[in-house]
A protein has these predicted regions:
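Double-stranded beta-helix
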Residues: 13-76, 98
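Non-heme Fe(II)/2-oxoglutarate
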Residues: 35, 66, 72-159
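Acidic, His- and aromatic-enriched active-site or binding-groove loops in soluble protein domains
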Residues: 1-4
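Noncatalytic linker/hinge segments flanking ATPase motor cores
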Residues: 11-15, 19, 31, 44-55, ...
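Short, structured patches in soluble enzyme cores that scaffold and shape functional sites
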Residues: 8-12, 24, 93
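Short, hydrophobic/aromatic alpha-helical segments in well-folded domains
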Residues: 6-9, 76
Length: 159
């Protein structure tokens, strides 16, 4: 519950292009259900009794902008009805000492091998603040699997 997410649509987001919508105040409902958006069947969280009847507020974010939301905020994206790919980067910030609630799939903590009830603390989830001046964490290791074509070749042909 002590997390904040930065949602960064790299090309901006529009209502036709997959804008994110939020249920106002839903982070206070006490619902702690993680939905795996990467696999499995989609689940309609908007049908939950706590949210029934609430309408998401969709936010268009301009290129270069960031939308922040509490980790327990119910959120949903509109479908992308444009010919462009919706490119988004997400960063999740955890409070120092935060523990993993369950063992369900979550890329932010799975990469570091953090089990349920363990503190979320690793080179992949460094403490951002406070840190002593000059005390920088070691960079995280690269992902095991690389996406096709990434990283792009450098101009000198070296990867």
């Amino acid at each position: 519950s002590d997390t904040i997410t930065a949602w960064v649509p790299l090309d901006g987001s529009t209502l036709d292009g997959g804008a994110m919508g939020y249920i106002a105040g839903s982070h206070r409902f006490g619902v702690r259900k993680f939905v795996d958006i990467f696999s499995g069947e989609p689940e309609d969280l908007l049908a939950a009794p706590e949210v029934r009847g609430a309408e998401p507020i969709f936010v268009e974010v301009p290129r270069g902008g960031v939308a922040f939301h509490h980790g327990l905020t119910f959120h949903v994206a509109k479908p992308n009805r444009t010919p462009r790919t919706r490119r988004v980067h997400t960063m999740i910030f955890f409070r120092d000492g935060c523990t993993r609630a369950s063992g369900g799939f979550h890329p932010s903590v799975d990469r570091a091998g953090i089990e349920a009830e363990q503190a979320i603390a690793s080179s992949v989830t460094p403490i951002a603040w406070p840190r002593a001046s000059g005390d920088l964490p070691e960079p995280p290791p690269p992902p095991v699997e690389r996406l096709w074509g990434w990283p792009p070749p450098r101009r000198d042909g070296v990867r």
